[in-house]
Amino acid sequence: MKFTLFCIALAAFLSMGQCNPDFRQIMQQCMETNQVTEADLKEFMASGMQSSAKENLKCYTKCLMEKQGHLTNGQFNAQAMLDTLKNVPQIKDKMDEISSGVNACKDIKGTNDCDTAFKVTMCLKEHKAIPGHH
């Protein structure tokens, strides 16, 4: 899978509508900080984003969520997520379903902040509260 396609898929997965330059930069920073390779991300996406992931991938998810304002001090910020999602034109007609899913995931806590971010992301995926999973 080419990086651009992967970037779009991951961006949609993490609630951004497109892979804009700012988000691409955030992805690169989080990859470097958490020693996650493009191959690691491709493997995770190819496996259907299973809930079993290495700690560095969980921390990569935390990094992305924090930089987007969706995770603060280890707490999922459901309202910030909804504020981001309502600006994605492709999903405006699904906001009721998405809002329900986001709210279902808002109190999830993991064993640490990385685990929390990952569990929230898996919950959002399960509840079809993130673009690209409808």
UniProtKB/Swiss-Prot annotation:
Belongs to the PBP/GOBP family. InterPro entries: PBP/GOBP, PBP_GOBP_sf. Residues 1-19 form the signal peptide. GO terms for cellular component: extracellular region; extracellular space. Gene3D superfamilies: Pheromone/general odorant binding protein domain (1.10.238.20). GO terms for biological process: mating pheromone secretion; negative regulation of male mating behavior; olfactory behavior; response to pheromone; sensory perception of chemical stimulus; sensory perception of smell. Expressed in both gustatory and olfactory systems of larvae and adults. Expressed in antenna, proboscis and larval chemosensory organ. Expressed in five sensilla on each third antennal segment, in the pharyngeal organs and in the dorsal organ, terminal organ and the ventral pits of the third instar larvae. Also expressed in wing and tarsi. Disulfide bonds join C30-C63, C59-C114, C105-C123. This is General odorant-binding protein 56h. One of its GO terms (molecular function) is odorant binding. Keywords: Disulfide bond, Olfaction, Secreted, Sensory transduction, Signal, Transport. Changing D115H: In strain: 307A, 318A, 390A, 705A, 707A, 732A, 736A, 797A and 868A. Present in the aqueous fluid surrounding olfactory sensory dendrites and are thought to aid in the capture and transport of hydrophobic odorants into and through this fluid. May function in both olfactory and gustatory systems. It is found in: Secreted. Its main location: secreted. SUPFAM superfamilies: Insect pheromone/odorant-binding proteins.
